[in-house]
């Protein structure tokens, strides 16, 4: 398992060649069975193009404690692995979080842009000072989605009815809430 921290500093350094840099990084995480198969869609989902439009000072203000976050992610993975099998090739990519305009009045909402694109790839938008308990819960939820034996990988866009989506989300919620504190802001 690997963790990539696509930090504000890295994005700032890659700014002159950002499109090529993001294309290479994101495209390497996409396969023919990914939910999102276009690197620009992933970059847009995580507002990376918008982030690149910020000034250097604004970009760096979104920095987080990389060592602490790596430790939290590693510990969370170990906890989850006691209960479910995870893909050994799993790649967790952390990117800077920008607020969504429709939840701008809820501080915690900035940490809810998370996506499992395939059993080998989880993306998390992370704010500078995340609530660690909430981050653990959120990551456990996504790790549940990423488990290679999860029936989600039998679903396609053609056979993914709403009731299956509710089951998928509900089981991931139940699983993560059994392991970590309930810090959900939407409950």
Q: How would you name each of these model-derived features?
A:
Residues 53-118, 132:
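Auxiliary, metal-adjacent structural segments of Zn-dependent hydrolase domains
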Residues 119, 126-127, 143, 151, ...:
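Conserved binding/catalytic microenvironments
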Residues 123-139:
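Short pre-active-site segment immediately N-terminal to the catalytic Zn-binding motif
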Residues 137-151, 173:
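Active-site recognition of the HExxH zinc-binding catalytic motif
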Residues 159-187:
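Post-HExxH zinc-binding segment in Zn-dependent metallohydrolases
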């Amino acid at each position: 398992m690997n963790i990539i921290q696509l930090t504000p500093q890295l994005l700032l350094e890659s700014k002159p060649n950002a499109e090529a840099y993001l294309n290479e990084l994101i495209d390497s995480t996409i396969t023919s069975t990914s939910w999102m198969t276009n690197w620009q869609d992933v970059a847009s989902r995580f507002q990376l193009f918008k982030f690149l439009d910020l000034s250097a000072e604004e970009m760096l203000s979104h920095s987080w404690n990389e060592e602490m976050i790596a430790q939290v992610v590693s510990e969370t993975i170990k906890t989850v692995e006691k209960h479910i099998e995870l893909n050994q090739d799993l790649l967790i990519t952390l990117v800077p979080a920008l607020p969504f305009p429709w939840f701008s009045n809820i501080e915690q909402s900035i940490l809810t842009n998370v996506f499992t694109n395939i059993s080998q790839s989880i993306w998390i938008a992370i704010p500078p000072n995340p609530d660690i308990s909430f981050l653990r819960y959120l990551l456990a939820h996504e790790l549940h989605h990423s488990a290679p034996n999860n029936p989600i990988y039998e679903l396609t866009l053609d056979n993914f009815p709403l009731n299956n989506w509710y089951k998928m989300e509900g089981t991931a919620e139940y699983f993560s809430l059994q392991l970590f504190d309930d810090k959900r802001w939407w409950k």
